[in-house]
Amino acid sequence: YEKIGAEMVKEVAKKTDDVAGDGTTTATVLAQALVKEGLRNVAAGANPLGLKRGIEKAVEKVTETLLKSAKEVETKEQIAATAAISAGEQSIGDLIAEAMDKVGNEGVITVEES
């Protein structure tokens, strides 16, 4: 079961990165908690299929709530503010906003360590 759980957590992190580009740590912690509590409940006699259905319903509700509260990031200033929060530094947010302004929404920005 451990290998299956590790593979699932790895897949959660990959999908989160592919879809959102951020939040992999949060997704990994949540997935680990779900696996741990799920196994604990199954060991205590809970129906695994019932747990799965409950998790799926919870995912639907969380997704619905997140989509309702999501805000479009469109302007250069909004991009800079969002990137600064993610990077933890305003100057990096400004650089990312400038790069996005140059390449457009469909462009690719590659960041490398120097």
Curated annotation (Swiss-Prot):
Belongs to the chaperonin (HSP60) family. This is Chaperonin GroEL. InterPro entries: Cpn60/GroEL, Cpn60/GroEL/TCP-1, GROEL-like_equatorial_sf, TCP-1-like_intermed_sf. Keywords: ATP-binding, Chaperone, Cytoplasm, Isomerase, Nucleotide-binding, Stress response. GO terms for molecular function: ATP binding; ATP-dependent protein folding chaperone; isomerase activity. The keyword Cytoplasm applies. Its main location: cytoplasm. PANTHER family: 60 KDA HEAT SHOCK PROTEIN, MITOCHONDRIAL.
